[in-house]
């Protein structure tokens, strides 16, 4: 999903797109970016532990320094995803970020332990939605809309 969104954003050649895994991202990356697309699996009705760690490490160093920047959210969920989206929205509200779209929730319908642990295959329509969200964020930044 994140790779598809990055590919969509990269179509906007006026911008530099940087795709980072949560453990590799730091406050400096947030401060250097003009906008954000946060992507995470939902685990036990919450954002992943690695994404939570990212927000824990970067929240205060970025506070009052990223106000007004645009953001979007993508969640890969087994059945719901809304609680994870709300968690990120609350963090983004604290940072005073501006949402550009409702959270994109891709539901895998994984309900059994085997399905939950299995590597997920995201379908073409969902990947296109991810690409489109990345492209929308990038185009809005390039045009000065966001």
Regions found by a protein language model. Give the residues of each.
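Glycine-rich phosphate/pyrophosphate-binding loop and the adjoining helix
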Residues: 100-146
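A short beta-strand-loop structural module common to alpha/beta enzyme folds
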Residues: 12-24
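Generic secondary-structure signature for well-ordered alpha-helical cores
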Residues: 10-14, 60, 93, 97, ...
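Charged catalytic carboxylate motif
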Residues: 1, 29, 87, 129, ...
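Generic non-transmembrane alpha-helix signal with a bias for helix starts/N-cap capping motifs
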Residues: 2-3, 23, 85, 123
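Helix-loop-strand module that forms the ligand-binding subsite of alpha/beta enzymes
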Residues: 23-107
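N-terminal beta1-alpha1 ligand-phosphate binding loop
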Residues: 1-12
